[in-house]
């Protein structure tokens, strides 16, 4: 479950254990059904009651995907 997203990265919950410093190819669906494809580096992990909270940094996100995230944030923050 994605809790927050910005052009710099994403915060999310998962039951799966991921290692800090690891990289993943990701595909994220925004509310507008726009898809974001990016490499995500796990930079933070915090164990929680129902799994793990992760902070991930986007690596090499395209300008067009960054704009999609900016638009998502405008509507999400209303």
Across the structure, where does each feature detected by a protein language model lie?
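Structured alpha-helical
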Residues: 1-78
């Amino acid at each position: 479950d994605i809790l927050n997203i910005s052009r710099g990265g994403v915060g999310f919950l998962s039951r799966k254990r991921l290692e800090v410093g690891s990289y993943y190819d990701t595909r994220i669906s925004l509310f507008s059904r726009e898809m974001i494809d990016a490499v995500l580096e796990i930079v933070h992990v915090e164990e929680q009651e129902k799994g793990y909270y992760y902070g991930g940094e986007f690596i090499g996100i395209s300008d067009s995907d960054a704009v999609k995230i900016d638009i998502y944030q405008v509507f999400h923050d209303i």
